[in-house]
Structures are given as C-alpha cells and as structure tokens.
C-alpha cells in the first residue's frame, strides 16, 4: 500500500462538472492498494497517517502536531497508478495494483479506520474508479510518501 500525503490549505475533487468532496486545512491523500496488501497494511498506514506530526505548534515549531490536534480534515483519493512499475520500457506496468472489487473493499476499510480515528465529518472521499479532477493548495509544500512495505 502506498500513500502520497500532501499538506493542504484546501483541496477538492470534481467528477464531471460536480464537486463531490472538499476540505479546508488538512491532508489530501492519494491511496494506492497493491495485490499483496492485507488488513495489516491498512491498519499500519491508517495509524501512521492519524498520528503523523505534520503541523507546527502554536509557537511555530514544525512537525509537532497531528491532524486531530489541529482540527484538520482528510480528503482521500483512490489512485491505482501509485502501484505502477516503470523499470522497464516507456509504458507503466500496473500488474501490482489490486483489481477493482478487492481494492474497493480494502480502500473502504482504510476510510473506515480514518473516520473512526478522526470523525466521520472530518474525512472526505473521491469516487472510487472514477475519472476525477483534483485541485489542491499544497502548504510548504509538504509532500510525504508512505509505503506499508518499507
């Protein structure tokens, strides 16, 4: 499982012409589920994201507070392309990306764990499997990659 976390001052997801979800201050997560990912990977990375100290304290010292301590929000977007292999040729190989139904199930479990830890109203979602337009304002910029196998 791979996650690209971006610290944002705002983010939104649009499908077609409709904004389907949006957040203010928090994290936008791009989430890739691999063929060998299990519930243990979901547990590991959901805990890591919820406890990750990506925010300054009141005195301005960095990396001191987690998402709940700043009353932040999370916007998750399913992103199978994070599992691409690019070591051979000029075209990405997506064989390591989990296929539809099982990926959706694991992604749903990941979302449930984030909501349980942060609150239903604090975790938003894109549309699984849809072609989406993602807009964000990256703060810092802070972009961190998490990998459950690393």
Curated annotation (Swiss-Prot):
Pfam families: Tyr_Deacylase. Its EC number is 3.1.1.96. One of its GO terms (cellular component) is cytoplasm. It is found in: Cytoplasm. It comes from the Eukaryota. It catalyses: glycyl-tRNA(Ala) + H2O = tRNA(Ala) + glycine + H(+); a D-aminoacyl-tRNA + H2O = a tRNA + a D-alpha-amino acid + H(+). Its main location: cytoplasm. Keywords: Cytoplasm, Hydrolase, RNA-binding, tRNA-binding. InterPro entries: Daa-tRNA_deacyls_DTD, DTD-like_sf. Coiled coil: none annotated. A motif (Gly-cisPro motif, important for rejection of L-amino acids) lies at residues 140-141. One of its GO terms (molecular function) is D-tyrosyl-tRNA(Tyr) deacylase activity. Belongs to the DTD family. A Gly-cisPro motif from one monomer fits into the active site of the other monomer to allow specific chiral rejection of L-amino acids. An aminoacyl-tRNA editing enzyme that deacylates mischarged D-aminoacyl-tRNAs. Also deacylates mischarged glycyl-tRNA(Ala), protecting cells against glycine mischarging by AlaRS. Acts via tRNA-based rather than protein-based catalysis; rejects L-amino acids rather than detecting D-amino acids in the active site. By recycling D-aminoacyl-tRNA to D-amino acids and free tRNA molecules, this enzyme counteracts the toxicity associated with the formation of D-aminoacyl-tRNA entities in vivo and helps enforce protein L-homochirality. Homodimer. This is D-aminoacyl-tRNA deacylase. It comes from Kluyveromyces lactis (strain ATCC 8585 / CBS 2359 / DSM 70799 / NBRC 1267 / NRRL Y-1140 / WM37) (Yeast). The gene is DTD1.
């Amino acid at each position: 499982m791979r996650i690209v976390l971006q610290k944002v001052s705002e983010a939104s997801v649009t499908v077609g012409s409709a904004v389907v979800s949006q957040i203010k201050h928090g994290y936008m997560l791009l989430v890739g589920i691999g063929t060998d990912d299990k519930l243990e990977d979901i547990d590991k990375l959901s805990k890591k994201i919820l406890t990750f100290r990506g925010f300054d304290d009141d005195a301005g010292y960095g990396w001191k507070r987690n998402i709940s301590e700043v009353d932040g929000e999370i916007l998750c977007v399913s992103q199978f392309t994070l599992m691409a292999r690019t070591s051979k040729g000029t075209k990405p190989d997506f064989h390591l990306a989990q296929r539809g139904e099982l990926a959706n199930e694991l992604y749903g479990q990941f979302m449930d764990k984030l909501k349980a830890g942060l609150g239903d109203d604090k975790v938003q979602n894109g549309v699984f499997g849809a072609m989406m337009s993602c807009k964000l304002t990256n703060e810092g910029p802070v972009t961190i990659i998490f990998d459950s196998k690393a």
